[in-house]
């Protein structure tokens, strides 16, 4: 599955290039995190460069910057890029070019010098240039949350971006598509391929049309046919293993039918909320759900429409927490502490620095998804101990 998703990412990128060429755009902007690793593997670099070369052959300029995931990408460790591809350095810089129609365009941006940037780099962006027809900002970061423990990615204020009076802001970092402002288009297109269950739904880019005296035209474009999908439901009472089997099979078949109807492929998670006060049902979930799910994975392994990837069951209700022992209460407090990504990362420092992790596992694992999975499983264990008293 990992290899299939890697190929899906390349296919999605190539479709993006196809659309740019077919639409005869003036330029393509790639706002960081082109790679999942600090430097990018040679295979990843080759795929990127091949697409940029196609743009070059079509007479389309491309502008790229590196973000917090690929901050170590440097010229001497990277395959050569086409002449029409311009890379932003590690300080805020403005690059200019002229379109085929003769429009003068300025683009301001920067690449990350390190993984975390707590400084607001938007303060170094100049006001809109008066001598150009269009001024575009490229920025890899996120809105300031006013919390030093969370503001690690060049935190900015939306109001400040608006004050700079640019014609368009191409943002990177947030993997979900969202538009922060309409009057001045400030847009996260999201990533081009979901890689875990925090990145569900359609993925792609945006096609932006700017014309003086007119409102910008923003069009979302979908470029991937592999999507992550979460089937969420409240679990009914379970009276036997066959009930669990029927529940899983019915959910799976419904998703297969939908995938075929839409011409898509799903990576599927079954997510159920289980009533903790129903001790009989809870016992079946605890004792049989995982093994049964594994058997269904094997049964459906050759099914190409929907890959049955994951099962999560979450115990709902916490009415017995007041009956917890001091030890169990301390466990829950510790669990709350590790909701902070920085605290969670500190525990994993030795693992994350290990060469085998960085080489084989880091490209395939989302740390935020891993954190969520660990915390949910731990919470379930604590609640199970309470409900089984």
Residue ranges with predicted function:
Residues 33-37, 142-144, 275-277:
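A short, flexible beta-alpha/helix-coil linker loop
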Residues 27, 38-209:
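His/Asp/Glu-rich metal-coordinating catalytic cores
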Residues 18-21, 53, 159-162, 253, ...:
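Surface-exposed alpha-helical segments enriched in charged/polar residues
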Residues 93-100, 189-250:
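Binuclear metal-dependent phosphoesterase catalytic core
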Residues 12-22, 96-98, 123-128, 256-259:
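Short amphipathic alpha-helices and their capping/turn segments at secondary-structure boundaries
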Residues 1-45, 369:
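N-terminal active-site segment of His-dependent metallophosphoesterases
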Residues 24, 106, 133, 165, ...:
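Short loop/turn motifs at secondary-structure junctions
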Residues 224-389:
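Accessory, non-catalytic peripheral segments of nucleic-acid enzymes
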């Amino acid at each position: 599955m990992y290899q299939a998703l890697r190929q899906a990412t390349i296919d999605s990128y190539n479709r993006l290039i196809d659309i740019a060429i077919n639409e005869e755009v003036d330029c393509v902007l790639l706002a960081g995190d082109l790679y999942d690793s600090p430097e990018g593997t040679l295979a990843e670099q080759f795929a990127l460069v091949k697409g940029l070369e196609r743009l070059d052959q079509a007479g389309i300029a491309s502008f790229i910057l590196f973000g917090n995931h690929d901050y170590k990408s440097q010229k001497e460790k990277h395959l050569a890029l086409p002449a029409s591809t311009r890379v932003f350095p590690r300080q805020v810089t403005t690059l200019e070019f002229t379109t085929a129609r003769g429009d003068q365009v300025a683009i301001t941006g920067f690449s990350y010098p390190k993984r975390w940037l707590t400084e607001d780099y938007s303060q170094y962006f100049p006001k809109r240039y008066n001598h150009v027809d269009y001024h575009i900002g490229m920025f890899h970061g996120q809105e300031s949350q006013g919390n030093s423990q969370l503001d690690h990615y060049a935190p900015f204020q939306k109001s400040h971006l608006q004050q700079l009076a640019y014609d368009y802001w191409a943002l990177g970092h947030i993997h979900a598509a969202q538009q922060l402002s309409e009057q001045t288009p400030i847009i996260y297109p999201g990533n081009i391929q979901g890689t875990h269950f925090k990145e569900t739904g359609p993925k792609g880019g945006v096609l932006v049309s700017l014309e003086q005296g007119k409102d910008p035209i923003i069009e979302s474009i979908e470029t991937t046919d592999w999507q992550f999908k979460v089937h969420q439901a409240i679990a009914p009472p379970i009276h036997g293993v066959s009930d669990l089997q029927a529940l899983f099979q019915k959910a799976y078949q419904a998703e297969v039918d939908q995938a075929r109807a839409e011409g898509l492929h799903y990576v599927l998670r079954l997510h159920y909320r289980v009533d903790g006060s129903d001790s009989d049902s809870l016992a079946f979930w605890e004792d049989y759900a995982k093994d049964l799910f594994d058997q269904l994975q094997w049964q459906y392994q050759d099914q190409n429409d929907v890959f049955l990837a994951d099962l999560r069951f979450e115990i709902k209700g916490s009415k017995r927490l007041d009956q917890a022992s001091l030890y169990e209460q301390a466990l829950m407090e510790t669990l709350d502490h590790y909701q902070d990504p920085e605290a969670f990362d500190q525990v994993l420092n030795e693992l994350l620095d290990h060469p085998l992790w960085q080489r084989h596992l880091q490209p395939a694992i989302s740390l935020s998804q891993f954190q969520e999975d660990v915390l949910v499983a731990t919470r379930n264990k604590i609640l199970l101990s309470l409900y089984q008293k």
